[in-house]
């Protein structure tokens, strides 16, 4: 069978042209492969963790993560309010409770509840990924959950939009018999049984 390849053709035909031999390459040290790119969530979680740890180091005196408690976390969340972009109307404001205020006011900008809730979720995961024990996770404490609930409720009232908890969908029970398309029920009668 004839080959369509030219590989080895010069040798088979007695060609006098020298064949090029692959030369061994000198050993070059290889750099370690680049780690896989982090997902957006993982990158944000790492940034949040580094920011929180830096916040603790900047405290007077500095606080180590192993000594961090819910009071440090609550202080951090309140510190973040200065960078917030959500207008939260105070009780004395004429726009308090209005869904779409008609004008401007001097009410403070704060972190939105959803942003704080997501932040705590990422920090909770990062704490455990960095060696923290789940049962000692300060981000999972009851005080943090109460704070987030209060922020959610107060922001909802200030905006005039009540927070509604989503109802969980009931799963259909596949074991229940349903009426057939022909109007019969899922039960069989003795007349349908083979004898």
UniProtKB/Swiss-Prot annotation:
InterPro entries: ALOG, ALOG_dom. One of its GO terms (cellular component) is nucleus. Residues 21-36 have a biased composition (Pro residues). Residues 184-195 have a biased composition (Low complexity). Residues 40-167 form the ALOG domain. Residues 162-175 have a biased composition (Basic residues). It is found in: Nucleus. Belongs to the plant homeotic and developmental regulators ALOG protein family. This is Protein LIGHT-DEPENDENT SHORT HYPOCOTYLS 7.
